[in-house]
Amino acid sequence: MSRRRKHDDSPSPKKTPHKTVAAEECGSVVEPGRRRLRSARGSWPCGAREGPPGPVRQREQPPTAALCSKSNPEERYETPKRALKMDSLSSSFSSPNDPDGQNDIFWDQNSPLTKQLGKGRKKQIYTTDSDEISHIVNRIAPQDEKPTTNSMLDMWIGETAIPCTPSVAKGKSRAKISCTKLKTQSQEEELMKLAKQFDKNMEELDVIQEQNKRNYDFTQMISETEILSNYKDNIQMWSLHNIVPEIDNATKKPIKGNTKISVANNQNSSQKPFDQIAEAAFNAIFDGSTQKCSGQLSQELPEAFWSTSNTTFVKTNALKEEKIITNETLVIEKLSNKTPRSLSSQVDTPIMTKSCVTSCTKEPETSNKYIDAFTTSDFEDDWENLLGSEPFAMQNIDMPELFPSKTAHVTDQKEICTFNSKTVKNTSRANTSPDARLGDSKVLQDLSSKTYDRELIDAEYRFSPNSNKSNKLSTGNKMKFENSSNKIVIQDEIQNCIVTSNLTKIKEDILTNSTEASERKSALNTRYSNEQKNKCILNQSIKAPVNTDLFGSANLGSKTSVSNPNQTSASKVGSFFDDWNDPSFANEIIKACHQLDNTWEADDVDDDLLYQACDDIERLTQQQDIRKDSKTSESICEINNNSEHGAKLTQQQDIRKDSKTSESICEINNNSEHGAKNMFAISKQGSNLVQSKHLNPGSISVQTSLTNSSQIDKPMKMEKGEMYGNSPRFLGATNLTMYSKISNCQINNLHVSYTNTDVPIQVNSSKLVLPGSSSLNVTSDHMNTEITTYKKKLSTNQPCHKTVTDEAQSNLNTTVGFSKFTFTRMKNSQILSQFNQNCITGSMSDTKITQGVEKKKGVNPLLEEAVGQQSLVKLSESLKQSSKEEEEKNRKCSPEEIQRKRQEALVRRMAKARASSVNAAPTSFL
């Protein structure tokens, strides 16, 4: 290309056009001579060396062009200057197929000129029309340059082919091939040698395995005889397991004797397959995690390692080795594995007695599960189950110590549990992280399903051992089941001091299935007759100006925060480093684990089953609500506002009604396929389903005395959101709060009636039915995330301030107002501001049953349209009315509240977008 630029820039082609014309005329005649010159191209490299340099030849171009204008063609054609020029142009190109070389070779004055344009473009300038296509073709692609053969392959294949490799090279390549053959043959021989050696090693290992089996049989025989001689060494263990000491010795001592004798025999044997020290080190490494998780091992730990190392191929011996490790953590495992009769007696004895939950009621079944895992997997450690079994021991450490045992059998169990507490205390600090116990709910789910039917038989005392397990079952299903209450009954007569002082422990123990709570609650309920067994566990008093928790039992996934002045900091998760002797410390750890494990498993099948179960319950409750709605309203009218005794009678009647209805619905759903898994667990006392899908109709009366300064604050904070279908229900942390704030009304004896409690409410994918609301002359509002009928509107996260007016009759001393039901998710300050503006008595009715409004004195201006409706109002009409009331409220809101609402809407929108991404993620994640 540099030569071409020189020619382009040279003055010879551009000086005068007549020289170019003359050259063209010569080109039309001199074709034979030009071909002859091209045929001599084989000598171009030599000519290039002999010829003068390029600039000299360029200076010689004008005479050549001048000769073309003369009439002497032969001299023109045979002049060597022309040939030297052509040779010099092709001197730097060795390949005839090089396009750049061809362009440089065939360049002459007759070719079209190329004018350099900007940016690398070239423009051809055709000077004359005398050029023919054949001339151009002959110049560019002459025929004599074609190869003599028919195809390019003949240049390399055939007799006249160019030799690619000399004969010497071929000989060398053959020698190399022979070398490689020899190498491959030697490799095959080496592989055969290795295979033979491997076979020998395998045979030796088989022989060693047989010897190990013989040694094991021999040591087992000697260990059985050694039990009697070493009986004194096991006195301490026997005192801890004084129920069945022979079984304890039978499981512990054979391994002890086996370790001693097997080590001696293997050391004396002629063939040692493995390094004993190395094997002991490896076993120590692999058994280390089990030691850390399951507790401190016995004093024979090095011998146990030696036993495992010397019986590597003996799976039965290893199985017994694992049983020792498990027996250190779950001592009852020995009893359940060896004596099923003693196991059944341990399970049945606490049920027959009046004692509450003992540690043995859960541990035998847990140990059965793990023994089955060991026997079926053949020395495959189920690490997750070993980790999951730790919360059993942690939870059961302090339970028997909270109350005296009723029988000697329970005393034995108490001692065993004490042994577990000593074992676990040293290592449980390392296991306080909630992640270590996430497998607890999965294990408990199976255990509680086995003991679920035992609750129905167990109707003579308040808290059965299985009721605690059924509470744990709710953790696996992401629901908290209240097992011994049919409705929330607030009674002002029940020991205000006791309930106030113990409110923190009661709330906390409900969430953590503590036995202390059950003991205290049963003690509070023993003063009532057997007919009143169905009353709520939380017999709370709201007579004192103390903030109590109406939702006493929230979901395990939700944190029920109770604002109590006497409440300690025991409910804070940050107290992980407290004293282990504190009974509530283990409960706090388990509660933290449950809070982390409160989301559904990423399984669409469970969600579908839950939704189907919810639909079935809705159908059943709608049929029963229609029948009993009128009875409920009549029971409200019969309550005497000034009579405290009348309120008690009404409470008893309503509770009896509710218990009958709830038992019927619970039995129906308990027989269903999905009821046992996803819905709720009941206790045979006519236990209420506070956290279950539905509460039956009825009225619950509360006779309370409130002063002007008292305020009932009932917050429930939902920790984690739950996905219901594709729409988010609870996102982030939302306060589910029920406020009953007293305005400027001096009331000393205020009658509160809870009516029409048939409103299923969605809380963390489990429908929660709250009792209606208070018929007070004060602001009463129930904040609910979702009522089942309003799924569509609430699932889209619209800022709902819907009100549903229903039938309410109140005989208050001062004023009479009408109730409204709001479905909101607002901040507390916003609610209080609305409450201060509008002092409305609240009551909640069934959403799908027609609702009526009776007109009375002191009608609130916000409810004028609703008051005018004397007839029954359908759900759609009530929704329209609620939207109108919402618009009226929004008009009266201040700009600050409007701005706050906008911010909340923005937060909900962001939460919805985040939830949609989270909802789309499990499909790919699964």
UniProtKB/Swiss-Prot annotation:
A motif (RBM2 motif) lies at residues 891-913. Residues 1-112, 640-663, 878-905 are annotated as: Disordered. GO terms for biological process: DNA damage response; DNA repair; mitotic G2/M transition checkpoint; positive regulation of protein serine/threonine kinase activity; regulation of DNA damage checkpoint; replication fork processing. InterPro entries: ETAA1. One of its GO terms (molecular function) is protein serine/threonine kinase activator activity. Phosphorylated by ATR. There is a cross-link at residues 85, 414, 442, 480, 507, 533, 535 (Glycyl lysine isopeptide (Lys-Gly) (interchain with G-Cter in SUMO2)). A motif (RBM1 motif) lies at residues 603-618. Residues 72-85, 882-905 have a biased composition (Basic and acidic residues). Keywords: Coiled coil, DNA damage, DNA repair, Isopeptide bond, Nucleus, Phosphoprotein, Ubl conjugation. The modification Phosphoserine is found at residues 186, 464, 833. Its main location: nucleus. Expressed at high levels in the brain, liver kidney and Ewing tumor cell lines. GO terms for cellular component: cytosol; intracellular membrane-bounded organelle; nuclear replication fork; nuclear speck; nucleoplasm; plasma membrane. Residues 183-214 form a coiled coil. It holds the Pfam family ETAA1. Residues 640-653 have a biased composition (Polar residues). A motif (ATR-activation domain (AAD)) lies at residues 105-111. It is found in: Nucleus. The RBM1 (RPA1-binding, also named RPA70N-binding) motif mediates interaction with RPA1. The RBM2 (RPA2-binding, also named RPA32C-binding) motif mediates interaction with RPA2. Replication stress response protein that accumulates at DNA damage sites and promotes replication fork progression and integrity. Recruited to stalled replication forks via interaction with the RPA complex and directly stimulates ATR kinase activity independently of TOPBP1. Probably only regulates a subset of ATR targets. Interacts (via RBM1 motif) with RPA1. Interacts (via RBM2 motif) with RPA2. Interacts (via the ATR-activation domain motif) with ATR. This is Ewing's tumor-associated antigen 1. It comes from Homo sapiens.
